[in-house]
């Protein structure tokens, strides 16, 4: 909902006067209904203000969250080095182990 599209405020609704006719609406019923509408408007305004504040807070915290997330996704360098060395060792065993057994059979 865009702020530019809001046409009434709680005060506008409260101050609205309706013309009465011979068989018009019950003024008491209209007043009660308008009171409910005013309460809703006030509640919506409070909710919008709360959500705007929460939105600003989240916008400010987003860079910090992204930085901590990127740090947590990267494994420690020592772990990466260990994994690479283990793979290299297994590869050497596979390559040189086959050559060694082939030489013994000949």
From Swiss-Prot:
Recorded superkingdom: Bacteria
Region (Disordered): 55-83
Subcellular location: Cytoplasm
Stretches assigned to coiled coil: 34-67
The keyword Repeat appears for this protein: no
Pfam families: DivIVA
One GO CC term on file: cytoplasm
InterPro entries: Cell_cycle_GpsB, DivIVA_domain, DivIVA_fam
Compositional bias ranges of the Low complexity kind: 70-79
Transmembrane segments: none
Gene Ontology biological-process annotations: cell division; regulation of cell shape
Alphabetized UniProt keyword annotations: Cell cycle, Cell division, Cell shape, Coiled coil, Cytoplasm
Biological function: Divisome component that associates with the complex late in its assembly, after the Z-ring is formed, and is dependent on DivIC and PBP2B for its recruitment to the divisome. Together with EzrA, is a key component of the system that regulates PBP1 localization during cell cycle progression. Its main role could be the removal of PBP1 from the cell pole after pole maturation is completed. Also contributes to the recruitment of PBP1 to the division complex. Not essential for septum formation.
Family per similarity comment: Belongs to the GpsB family.
Family matches, as NCBIfam families: DivI1A_domain, PRK14127.1
Assembly information from the UniProt record: Forms polymers through the coiled coil domains. Interacts with PBP1, MreC and EzrA.
Protein's name in the database: Cell cycle protein GpsB
